[in-house]
From Swiss-Prot:
Keywords in alphabetical order: Acyltransferase, Transferase
Official protein name in the record: Uncharacterized N-acetyltransferase YjhQ
Domain of life: Bacteria
SUPFAM superfamilies the record matches: Acyl-CoA N-acyltransferases (Nat) (SSF55729)
Keyword flag Manganese: no
Similarity annotation: Belongs to the acetyltransferase family.
Enzyme class of the recorded protein, top EC level: transferase
EC number: 2.3.1.-
CDD domains named among the record's database cross-references: NAT_SF
Organism of derivation: Escherichia coli (strain K12)
Keyword Transcription regulation annotated: no
Gene Ontology terms, MF aspect: acyltransferase activity, transferring groups other than amino-acyl groups
Gene: yjhQ
Amino acid sequence: MTVHHFTFHITDKSDASDIREVETRAFGFSKEADLVASLLEDESARPALSLLARYEGKAVGHILFTRATFKGEMDSPLMHILAPLAVIPEYQGMGVGGRLIRTGIEHLRLMGCQTVFVLGHATYYPRHGFEPCAGDKGYPAPYPIPEEHKACWMMQSLTAQPMTLTGHIRCADPDETGALT
């Protein structure tokens, strides 16, 4: 088995072109890259966490966590939504995505984040600590999810004490006025 040595760092503005390249190559189109660029500039997404994975200096993966709140609540606990997670095709299956998730979760814990949500693959994210069916636990998604995909809306508590508050989750929406949706 080949051991690959990846490095991970919190991004800044100088990483913008590398983030765009990773997102575009991973998804095969620029829509996700455009969304990420907008979210990184959106005040309603803050505090955000953006991490880049590199292999021998080359950007190969990216993950973004943006602020989430309870709809209608001015003073929500610190929560985030993971979206998107991107790894360029030739580095998929090497553990880059999982390491980005774990590294991000550790940074979010240090920031005081209580919970992370994700809409993602129902068998992949539970391997990284996410619990399916967050809507059934009292945390409906910010957007409609068909019943057959409800297990894909997941959450992970980052504190020893689970949240006692429940409510409809709002996420940043850079296509709107910069307000949370």
